[in-house]
Amino acid sequence: MLFDTHAHLNAEQYDTDLEEVIERAKAEKVERIVVVGFDRPTITRAMEMIEEYDFIYAAIGWHPVDAIDMTEEDLAWIKELSAHEKVVAIGEMGLDYHWDKSPKDIQKEVFRNQIALAKEVNLPIIIHNRDATEDVVTILKEEGAEAVGGIMHCFTGSAEVARECMKMNFYLSFGGPVTFKNAKKPKEVVKEIPNDRLLIETDCPFLTPHPFRGKRNEPSYVKYVAEQIAELKEMTFEEIASITTENAKRLFRIN
């Protein structure tokens, strides 16, 4: 009934109680989860998890903060792994100008290389954008990303940016921040965008929704995101759960 399109259950924060976290997700009717890998260790763990759990799928890519560490061998490795039937997207990828570990020019190169790879293997992409909207949108356009489409992960941008992304065949995914009291912009965007472009996520263990803000996030909390969106859209929780699940299945080509 619920589909968490972006989770990091491969993070060390779940090393001691992963089974309990998964049981709570099932109890809240979270039927599918995409676990996102963004470097060698997290990709390796995501690939293990898709073998261990039938309802978990993987997205594999390289996070922009760590772009400086990515090698040609890493890109080739991701390409090889992407042939697995339960790898449903390339990413997360993108640009992050909040942290300065990786220079902007290297981030851009790694971003472009991953878009090219996704087009080659015909998989959608998952976009991480922090303080870099203009450059992200420009690169998506220049690299012809609309050929594969994908997700603007944890979208907090303006309605204008949302429209530009949707024109390029992207879905907008909302997480915990849409439940925050001061989140005026994402709430307005949720009201405006068509239902067939809407996804939900947790980005756990980060960005925990109200009323658990400040604690470790987990997939069961995606219901609070769905509840908030239902309220904003003046729809029922069940309608939003169904719409966002069908959208995710369509994007990821899951029957």
Curated annotation (Swiss-Prot):
One of its GO terms (molecular function) is metal ion binding. A divalent metal cation 1 binds at residues 6, 8, 92, 203. It comes from the Bacteria. A divalent metal cation 2 binds at residues 92, 128, 153. Its cofactor is a divalent metal cation. Gene3D superfamilies: Metal-dependent hydrolases (3.20.20.140). The keyword Hydrolase applies. This is Uncharacterized metal-dependent hydrolase YabD. It comes from Bacillus subtilis (strain 168).
